[in-house]
């Protein structure tokens, strides 16, 4: 019976990912709520209440995006899971809204988990955790927090996350993925490089002023692209060349020189967000899902992550891009990949989300 329920749940989730971005399932009530932040300030929180709850709870942590908990793809995913009777929470993590990859993100992540464990009905109930992209990195890091070691989540799943920031950035330079000697070429999305420069350019000395570049990056991470473009037009000299290298992913000598400065002078911060340096200490059962067509983080990052974790389940699928389902597949390939997804999600539902 549990096998049938898990397969049905997986099918509902896949159906939701294709249909729930622009429509709400009638079996799920959505609520804009709030929770007390680190300083007890009201912090936005989206809650998805199934009409027929099965008692399972999932916290879905967003990636680095100005849209945060309101990101359409996050909401689609939450709906697609909640239709199976699972109560889903998407908390705002304020530093991620500002695209600041600081250690405070971990504090907020653990803080919300602790707060949720104090809420009526959740005090003694197991909670499942999920993280998207950079949110996945922080969920993994949170598993090593003393509170989560004492009261661990029932299951952990990460989507499109990275293993080593440095190797992820190498993919951004050239779009090359070397998988078992096979070279795969993709056109990278510059978002990860934009976020990296947004975080570290103001912390290093590159030999000339970069205030203009920093202002452009601030506008870009806030999705203010028109204002950013206008400011780019006003830049001159080294700053103009640098911002074009960043947004066009030109692997110039100057671009590589500055990246080298980041990895040298900001090493501690970068290691903090690179599971390579600490994931071996994670004992939780972790489900890892990554798309072969992901242009933000290469799928080989998840393969490396899986090899270092002691208790993990991995699926690399051609049907997924970073946050969406791919339409660039033959019907036969799509059916084959769909069956793999159903098998993987069924195992995940049995391991955490089904009572």
Q: Where are each of the predicted segments found?
A:
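Catalytic active-site module of serine/aspartate enzymes centered on a nucleophile-bearing elbow/loop
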Residues: 325-355
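Catalytic nucleophile-loop/oxyanion-hole region of alpha/beta-hydrolase
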Residues: 70-77, 92-128, 138, 143-146
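Short beta-strand/loop motif that positions the catalytic acidic residue
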Residues: 282, 288-290, 294
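N-terminal cap/lid segment of alpha/beta-hydrolase-fold proteins
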Residues: 3-56
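Alpha/beta-hydrolase-fold enzymes
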Residues: 144-237
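Conserved alpha/beta-hydrolase "acid-adjacent" motif
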Residues: 270-271, 295-301
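Catalytic histidine neighborhood in serine/cysteine hydrolases
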Residues: 309-325
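Short, surface-exposed "cap/lid" segments of acyl-processing enzymes
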Residues: 49-84, 90-93
């Amino acid at each position: 019976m549990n096998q049938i329920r898990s397969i049905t749940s997986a099918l509902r989730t896949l159906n939701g990912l294709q249909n729930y971005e622009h429509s709400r399932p009638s079996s799920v009530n959505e609520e804009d709520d709030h929770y007390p932040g680190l300083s007890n300030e009201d912090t936005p929180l989206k809650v998805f209440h199934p009409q027929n709850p099965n008692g399972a709870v999932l916290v879905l942590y967003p990636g680095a995006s100005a849209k945060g908990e309101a990101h359409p793809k996050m909401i689609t995913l939450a709906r697609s899971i909640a239709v199976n009777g699972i109560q889903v929470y998407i908390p705002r993590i304020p530093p991620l809204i500002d695209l600041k990859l600081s250690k405070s993100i971990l504090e907020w992540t653990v803080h919300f988990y602790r707060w949720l464990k104090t809420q009526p009905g959740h005090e003694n109930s197991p909670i499942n955790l999920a993280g998207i992209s950079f949110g996945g990195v922080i969920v993994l890091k949170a598993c090593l927090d003393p509170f989560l070691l004492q009261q661990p989540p029932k299951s952990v799943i990460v989507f499109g996350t990275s293993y080593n920031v440095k190797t992820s950035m190498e993919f951004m330079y050239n779009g090359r993925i070397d998988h078992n000697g096979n070279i795969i070429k993709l056109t990278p999305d510059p978002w990860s490089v934009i976020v990296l420069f947004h975080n570290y350019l103001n912390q290093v000395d590159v030999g000339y002023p970069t205030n203009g570049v920093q202002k452009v990056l601030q506008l870009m991470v806030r999705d203010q692209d028109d204002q950013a473009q206008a400011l780019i037009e006003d830049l001159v000299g080294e700053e103009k060349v640098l911002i074009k290298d960043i947004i066009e992913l030109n692997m110039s000598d100057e671009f590589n020189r500055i990246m080298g400065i980041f990895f040298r002078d900001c090493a501690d911060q970068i290691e903090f967000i690179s599971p390579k340096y600490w994931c071996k200490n994670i004992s939780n059962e972790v489900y890892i899902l990554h798309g072969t067509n992901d242009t933000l983080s290469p799928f080989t990052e998840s393969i490396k992550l899986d090899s270092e974790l002691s208790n993990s389940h991995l699926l690399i699928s051609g049907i997924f891009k970073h946050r969406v389902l791919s339409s660039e597949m033959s019907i036969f390939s799509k059916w084959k990949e769909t069956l793999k997804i159903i098998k993987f999600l069924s195992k995940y539902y049995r391991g955490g989300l089904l009572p």
